Curated annotation (Swiss-Prot):
Residues 146-169 are annotated as: Disordered. One of its GO terms (biological process) is response to freezing. It is a multi-pass membrane protein. InterPro entries: Oleosin. This is Oleosin Ara h 10.0101. It is found in: Lipid droplet; Membrane. Residues 146-156 have a biased composition (Basic and acidic residues).
Length: 169
């Protein structure tokens, strides 16, 4: 303990700054330019991306043109089309709801069956366990019946002795 009388200090000397700069201010990595794989990616990506963007614009323009042409027809035939759309929409919603409820019921049934199988074992084991439980319950009921019969006999004897005592007095 006595050999540490003077405080110790730590000095940190940085040789590299942030982002790869050295202490002298020059970059550690010389400017080599983009790699060939990056150049190939840009060369192939730009035409493909441009083509897809062109197709998206054409699809939007076609949709707007079709909507502009068919809107007057929808307005003219709306007394027929609107109820038909409502009927078709409700039918589709009904089928989807029916399928969702059926799938939910099936998955719930599957979960319950897996839970029963994992928790309680196989069917023969369940039957054996049920037999043992029934035997235990039958033994318990038999013992209780004997106890109640004995208690009834004792109460009857007490009443008989009290009745005989009351006749004597």
């Amino acid at each position: 303990m006595t050999d540490r009388t003077q405080p110790h200090t730590v000095q940190v000397h940085t040789t590299a700054g942030r982002f790869g700069d050295t202490a002298a201010g020059t970059n550690r990595y010389p400017d080599r330019g983009p790699s060939t794989s990056k150049v190939i990616a840009v060369i192939t990506g730009l035409p493909i991306g441009g083509t897809l963007l062109l197709f998206a614009g054409l699809a939007l323009a076609g949709t707007l043109l079709g909507l502009a042409v068919t809107t007057p027809l929808f307005i003219l035939f709306s007394p027929v089309i609107v109820p038909a759309i409502i009927v078709v929409g409700l039918s589709v919603a009904g089928f989807l709801t029916s399928g969702a409820c059926g799938l939910t019921g099936l998955s719930s049934f599957s979960w319950v069956m897996n839970y029963i199988r994992q928790t309680h074992g196989s069917v023969p084991e369940q039957l054996e366990m049920a037999k043992h439980r029934m035997a235990d319950v039958a033994g318990y009921v038999g013992q209780k019946t004997k106890d109640v019969g004995q208690k009834t006999k004792e109460v009857g004897q007490e009443i008989q002795t009290k009745a005989q005592d009351s006749k004597r007095t």
